[in-house]
A protein has these predicted regions:
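Nucleic-acid nuclease catalytic cores
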Residues: 65-90, 94-230
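Acidic/proline-rich low-complexity IDRs
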Residues: 14-15, 23-26, 42, 103, ...
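Residue-level signal for secondary-structure boundary elements
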Residues: 36, 40, 226-232
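Charged, glycine-rich intrinsically disordered N-terminal tails and low-complexity linkers that flank
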Residues: 1-54, 58, 145
Length: 232
């Protein structure tokens, strides 16, 4: 029911026109429909979805150990106070002052809450990631060889498409926009995506800078879209 009352992070890529699976029109109709459709009810039965739900606590535990950061999972769906048509629930939230094992970018960012999005990539889905630009990879060249890499430069001000920015960070565009909505909710300077690759049972962590341009577009497109939902 809460998901019907606004646009969550998983809706962000649809609002911005970069979701390859769902159109904006389909999303608007879904939001205007009070009850879950049969198709939506079946989503929870999919093996990939059940696997993701079951593995989420394990991935949070592994990411917490890798980063030396306490990561908690908030239990509720939250509403943006200034933008009530936007909602947010979090897979994980960490606090930067507790980071011990990882080189974070700026001392001024200490004490900030940051989103840590959790994903499981199937063997088919992992082609959408580039672990060679991840800030941490558990397996490299097929061997267990935990490796850290420098944080990528901030490209949020570059005149790039969302797809190009997502490719730069090594993640799918629909998770780039989701992370941006999560960062906006927390006023976070950056966020992380912790991914377990099903094929070799390894975790990679991707670092993404805040993108004000994309966040502003989410506010505008979300408002416009919600007006259309209310008119349906």
């Amino acid at each position: 029911k809460a998901r019907r009352n606004g646009f969550g992070g998983s809706d962000s890529s649809i609002l911005l026109g970069v979701n390859p699976f769902t159109t904006l029109r389909q999303l608007l109709i879904q939001k205007a429909t009070p009850e879950l459709t049969e198709e939506e009810k079946q989503v929870g039965q999919l093996a990939a979805v059940r696997k993701g739900n079951d593995l989420e606590p394990l991935i949070i535990q592994k990411a917490s150990k890798i980063l030396g950061m306490e990561i908690v999972k908030p239990p509720h769906m939250y509403m943006f106070q200034d933008f009530p048509y936007l909602k947010m629930n979090f897979d994980g939230v960490g606090k930067t002052e507790k980071v011990e094992n990882f080189q974070l970018p700026e001392a001024s960012d200490l004490g900030k809450y940051i989103p840590v999005e959790i994903k499981v990539a199937t063997e088919k889905g992992q082609r959408h990631y580039n672990p060679f630009v991840a800030v941490y990879s558990e397996v490299v060249a097929g061997k267990l060889n935990p490796t850290t890499r420098p944080i990528l430069a901030d490209v949020s001000n570059m005149d790039w498409t969302i797809e190009k920015k997502a490719e730069y960070y090594g993640i799918p565009q629909y998770y780039y926009t989701q992370l941006q909505q999560e960062m906006m909710a927390l006023d976070a300077p950056y966020g992380m995506l912790a991914v377990m690759f099903d094929a070799d049972w390894s975790v990679s962590i991707f670092f993404v800078w805040r993108d004000i341009k994309v966040q502003n577009r989410l506010k505008i497109e979300g408002f416009t879209a919600w007006q259309k939902v209310e008119d349906l």
